[in-house]
């Protein structure tokens, strides 16, 4: 079996820490470099439910997309939720490694996985990484549909292909408009509106769209895409877990490590229920 340090080196080759945003907190959080690794679990969030799942699985390494401590802390006491995660992992000899914004911009990265889940053909990054001469790394992806769909059909595909959440898919725009090109960005995306406009796509699928930015963007019809599709943050990033697991599986096979790599299907989206408004004449619209 490989040592943790060997597996981490392989993960760092996939998602180098130096490509993370300056504010981010990526890399190995807990773990003994010389410990042996057999089972690896991928998940979006390093929360207690996932730590407990890792224990039940007998995992030696937990790889998550979101950081455990994005901001500084003065305690890892087990009386705190994050401290309890740390204690659970250490007591059970489970290492924790985080790949966040360095996985967002990777080639392939979070948005490639999202595009793949929706059967979209990736054309280029939405926001190219200027440090990549090949022009393949960057934030978000500009994609083409193999065959045109209506906004309604694209939303239905997203609802079917992405993991189920209480939110589902919210839509702004004409549900019958035709979509041939779409920009996607896993995770929060309303900071990318200027890049979406510049890309000239028909639709933008992302997460965490706020009222005012979305309203202003949609109102500027001359420069905005036909539709906005807003999915749950967790759901747009979960496909990366499958991508990362497949990449590590390939590395394991190449090195003869015989790792057992798993993807958590535990839903850690914070929203647990949705109550629909009263029906209107337009099922995808809102009352006057």
Predicted regions and their residues:
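Hydrophobic structural segments
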Residues: 1-288
């Amino acid at each position: 079996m490989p040592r943790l340090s060997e597996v981490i080196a392989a993960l760092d080759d996939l998602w180098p820490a130096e490509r993370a945003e300056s504010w981010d907190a990526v890399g190995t959080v807990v773990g003994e470099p010389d410990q042996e690794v057999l089972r690896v679990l991928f998940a979006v969030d390093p929360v207690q439910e996932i730590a407990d799942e890792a224990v039940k699985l007998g995992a030696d390494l937990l790889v998550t997309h979101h950081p455990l401590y994005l901001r500084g802390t003065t305690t890892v006491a087990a009386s705190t939720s994050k401290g309890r995660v740390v204690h659970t992992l250490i007591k059970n000899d489970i290492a924790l490694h985080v790949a966040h914004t360095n996985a967002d911009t990777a080639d392939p990265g979070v948005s490639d996985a999202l595009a793949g889940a929706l059967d979209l053909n990736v054309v280029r990054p939405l926001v190219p990484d200027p440090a990549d001469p090949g022009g393949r790394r960057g934030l978000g992806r500009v994609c083409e549909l193999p065959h045109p769909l209506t906004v309604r059909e694209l939303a239905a595909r997203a609802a079917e292909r992405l993991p189920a959440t209480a939110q589902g898919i919210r839509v702004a725009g004409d549900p019958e408009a035709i979509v041939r090109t779409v920009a996607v960005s896993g995770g929060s995306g309303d900071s990318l509106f200027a890049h979406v406009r510049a890309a000239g796509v028909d639709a933008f699928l992302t997460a965490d769209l706020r009222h005012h930015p979305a309203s202003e963007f949609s109102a500027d019809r001359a420069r905005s895409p036909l539709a906005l599709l807003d999915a749950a943050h967790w759901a747009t990033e979960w496909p990366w877990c499958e991508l990362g697991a497949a990449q590590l599986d390939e590395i394991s096979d190449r090195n003869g490590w015989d790792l057992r790599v798993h993807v958590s299907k535990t839903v850690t989206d914070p929203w647990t229920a949705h109550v629909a408004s009263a029906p209107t004449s337009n099922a995808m619209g809102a009352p006057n």
